[in-house]
């Protein structure tokens, strides 16, 4: 009996998880590598060790515009992995935003804390160079799902100048950054509803984490996202300076002094897709190399899911 084709996937966010699940279900051997401490990518969550509070400091909600992701959301909702929150048609994940990605990757070979630094390919297949540990295996196919500039650097490590013409589209993708600020506060902040969207100024939105489904009984805590413009202007500042500036902006917005019991800033350099690659995925059939992500279809979790699934279908057809 022939061994199943071996596929390496770089990135354990929604695009990588979607591609991994489709390929695994089609009978291929999938190995996922991610530099983070946990899966999820920008569907990120952080637990403060002192307070035990969870903060979704990346993507906040899931929405479905098309049938494929709507079907997946319905299945997750039936199993308690997501629940309606904030507005009609929007969902938060339970107990945190990594849950849908963890569900897609359940039972698969996943390596976190593994940074892929280079790629090589010969007649036998693909090899990965890792910063943390050696990886001796040869893979029949390779899927890249990091933000486009990071994927471009990996491809350049193999073919400087993007010698593979099918990946020139990576250069079309553009992103806006986002500074995220996680705050635990003595009491719930005085704004109506679960999400505050000022519409102008340094703050794009404030999300009431303690009101999300599955967080009942949690002490008051919020996640603040700075606006793309403010984040770009302060991109290289220290987290401490950003914390102080955004805390002052929030106090001015609410007309009160805020004394958090916990605060931590996180910078997302590639937060929001502002220009796409112009295709659902990028693929070189001869090399069996593909790229998927929200950079292909737009700034939504659904776009990452659809892109990963579409690339997986194409790759599965070739491998079969």
Language-model regions: role of each:
Residues 24-49:
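Glycine-rich FAD pyrophosphate-binding loop
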Residues 112-126:
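A conserved short coil-to-beta-strand element within the FAD-binding core of flavoproteins
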Residues 251-287:
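Flavin (FAD/FMN) cofactor-binding core of flavoprotein oxidoreductases
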């Amino acid at each position: 009996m022939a061994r199943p084709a071996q596929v390496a996937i770089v990135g354990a966010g929604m695009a990588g998880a979607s591609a991994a699940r489709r390929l695994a279900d089609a009978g291929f051997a999938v190995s996922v590598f991610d530099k983070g401490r946990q899966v999820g990518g920008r569907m990120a969550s952080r637990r403060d060790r002192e307070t035990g509070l969870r903060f979704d400091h990346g993507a906040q909600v899931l929405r479905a515009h098309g049938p494929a992701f709507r079907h997946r959301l319905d299945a997750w909702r039936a199993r308690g992995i997501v629940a309606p929150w904030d507005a009609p048609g929007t969902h938060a994940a339970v107990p945190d935003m990594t849950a849908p990605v963890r569900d897609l990757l359940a039972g698969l070979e996943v390596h976190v804390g593994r940074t892929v630094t280079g790629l090589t390919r010969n007649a036998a297949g693909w090899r990965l160079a890792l910063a943390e540990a050696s990886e001796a295996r040869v893979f029949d196919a390779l899927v890249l799902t990091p933000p486009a500039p990071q994927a471009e650097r990996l491809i350049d490590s193999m073919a400087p100048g993007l010698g593979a013409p099918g990946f020139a589209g990576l250069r079309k993708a553009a992103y806006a950054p986002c500074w995220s600020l996680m705050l635990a506060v003595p009491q719930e902040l005085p704004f109506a509803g679960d999400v505050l969207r000022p519409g102008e100024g340094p703050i794009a939105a404030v999300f009431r984490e303690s009101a999300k489904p599955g967080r009942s009984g949690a002490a008051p805590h919020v996640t603040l996202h700075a606006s793309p413009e403010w984040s770009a202007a302060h991109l290289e500042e220290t987290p401490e300076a950003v914390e102080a500036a955004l805390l002052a902006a929030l106090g001015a917005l609410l007309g009160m002094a805020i004394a958090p019991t916990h605060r931590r800033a996180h910078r997302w350099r590639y937060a929001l897709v502002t220009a796409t690659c112009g295709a659902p995925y990028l693929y070189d059939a001869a090399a069996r190399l593909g790229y998927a992500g929200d950079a292909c279809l737009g700034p939504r979790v659904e776009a990452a899911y659809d892109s990963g699934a579409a690339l997986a279908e194409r790759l599965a057809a070739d491998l079969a």
